[in-house]
């Protein structure tokens, strides 16, 4: 197997993400751009975790034009990969979905069928490992920008996987002038 094309893809994706991080200073972007960022992240992690995860999308097409804080999905995807595959003896699938809810909000769901965790043990694990900072940061950024009616909820069950649901207001993205 020739690894040059794989490395080229990885370098290209890393370059793209570095540009998004260092050059572009937009705090809010359209969901379509966030998904593009996420795809580049998955390309990089796919090299590192070869064959350990697969990604499936079910995105409501019209939702791609709505706004989301930049890099809100990447920490959730990172947790799905790192923690979902930790004790897995087979590849996991990460599902990314978007839909509009009845209360005029946009729901973005990242769920995996990985090992999951016991929510009672989460606080102890976070203290020991220093984990959970990215997830807390995503929730705090959403609440700070949109108010406390919006944010992130996480549900997990041992042996079944984890579901992260972002709730955002239904606001069409408008390019900053």
Model-inferred region functions:
Residues 1-155, 161-167:
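Two-component histidine phosphotransfer core
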Residues 171-176:
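Short, charged/polar, Gly/Pro-enriched secondary-structure boundary elements
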């Amino acid at each position: 197997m020739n690894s040059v094309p794989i490395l080229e893809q990885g370098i290209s994706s890393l370059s793209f993400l570095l540009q998004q991080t260092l050059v572009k200073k937009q705090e809010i972007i359209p969901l379509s751009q966030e998904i593009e960022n996420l795809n580049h992240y998955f390309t990089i992690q796919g090299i590192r975790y070869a064959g350990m995860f697969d990604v499936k999308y079910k995105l409501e097409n019209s939702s791609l034009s709505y706004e989301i804080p930049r890099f809100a999905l990447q920490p959730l995807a990172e947790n799905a990969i790192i923690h979902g595959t930790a004790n897995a003896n087979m590849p996991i699938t990460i599902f990314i979905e978007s839909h509009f809810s009845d209360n005029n909000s946009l729901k973005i769901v990242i769920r995996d069928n990985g090992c999951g965790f016991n929510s009672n043990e989460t606080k102890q694990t976070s203290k020991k490992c220093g984990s959970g900072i990215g997830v807390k940061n995503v929730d705090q950024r959403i609440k700070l920008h949109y108010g406390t009616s919006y944010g992130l909820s996480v549900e997990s069950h041992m042996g079944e996987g984890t579901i992260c649901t972002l709730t955002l207001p239904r606001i069409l993205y408008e390019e900053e002038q």
